[in-house]
Amino acid sequence: MSELVNGKSQKKENLLNLSLDATEAEREKSPALQMGYDQNTKRWELIIQYNGTVEKLQEQLPQAEIYPLSGGYAIVRLPESQVDDLAGLSQVEYIEKPKRLYFEVNRAIRDTCIAPVQSGNQVSQNVYGRDADLSGRGTLTAIIDSGIDYFHPDFRNADGTTRIAALWDQEQNRIYTREELNRALEAGSRERAYEIVQSRDVSGHGTAVAGIAAGLDGAYRGIAYESDLLVVKLGTPLADSFPRTTELMRALDYVVGIAQEWRMPVAVNLSFGNTYGSHDGTSLLETYLNSMAERGRTSIIVGTGNEGYGMGHRAGFLQMGRPVEIELAVGEYQTGFGVQLWKLYQDRFSVEIFSPGGSSTGVIRESLGAQRLSYETEEILLYYGMPSPYSQAQEIYLDLIPKGSYIQDGLWKIRLIPEEIRDGQYDLWLPAGMALNRETRFLAASPDTTLTIPSTASRAISVGAYDDATQAYADFSGRGFARLGHPIKPELVAPGVNIITARAGGGYEAVTGTSFAAPFVTGSAALMMQWGIVNGNDPYLYGEKLKAYLIRGARSLPGETVYPNERVGYGALCLERSFPL
């Protein structure tokens, strides 16, 4: 049976096929289509799942740069002219393009029941009859983020030496060792230190995350404050303001590999995500994260994002004879963007698009592959995709590309016309709020299933945010469940509003977002692995077992009567209650 449908390889994800069909001018005006493509070199960076050996792949594609990852995944950079050759190899099982990632930008420690189990607290006598006295010693806390202010006292021991075991700066393609970091700290001033270790956290995001998970200093001490830190500063190989999923996959491969080499348990923190995908855990990024989480003594914690009130999701059910009209407001000076529509493949319906001026595309019936539709001021690329070997979901992707600089502002309408309905559920997602004008949104948005990818990965411990001052769900926090209701996400919530933590450049600051809820759970996971693995109480306390203990220990919040629910999962983090009886 042919691997081609309408001349397109079924091994390539829908968005990649559409990107390859687009002209360079169209890609240039579409952030989603251009991601992964270098216009200067005419090369693509792609994610593949494969079998066999990398050497065999390299032999068949000598012009390609192949970066093997664990578990049969790899990142490939190759000329556009060879993408079809890559898809034609029997070793290659599936191909995706990278996606852009966005950051998910003390009373809280007391509120999460962490203080009773931390070393140095008077109440730290025992946990359900077992000695606690935990600080994270003997564990690794991995921060994959924007870097870290290694000069900050939160990340230095009492003698001034570094707590950072290794720092991989992907932008510099340089790994700094503990010894190099200590030499930099011995230089005295920041200016002299940066002459030795040049890595800086420009945004401060990673420093703030690390301070919550593992900060050491003073009144704002973090959770696993004696754990060793393993830090990756995500790179941006092209002129992007945010990293991509390919950098994240390389970072995961590195930190999990180092932890296994050093035979240390590791809690990995991921405080970013994106909205592109079916939100059912089946993308290559999500399955790769699952494979990493299944490695021994590893727990991966992911924030659910800040799209809860972003009005970037619309969901509903189609019924025969009842078309649905979805209203999409586009703000002034909005550049090109894409709209994803996901449904089950067994349902069949057509699409009609109306511009703010009332012009219609006419009814667009299913036709696999790319279709070009032209307005006076925009071009719309529409792509009816196929289900993949990993998901029954079908994507209809709409990319609005301005002929000038901006999309026509005003009220756009997307009409869904049922033709054959067996299930009827549909979901539409816009890009992350940080990529859009504030006025660009669905008018009748659906707040559920607004969690970002990869928090939809089944093996991740997915964390939303609540306000510990009001004991209420934080309305910005990405909600579950995953699409079609499974898996149940988030598993739990942690404080994410006005959290005091380390500031890049020195001192402390208040931060808000699920970015800063996730590290409460990351630090807690490190403490649990110290108790279980390092202290010898349970050598298997990691991954899904650790997740189960956290879920069982989660406490209820006022106003939340049914658990699990889409807002807070099974409840709020309570570490003291999460240890086994």
Regions found by a protein language model. Give the residues of each.
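Hydrolase catalytic cores
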Residues: 210-213, 230-238, 256-266, 348-350, ...
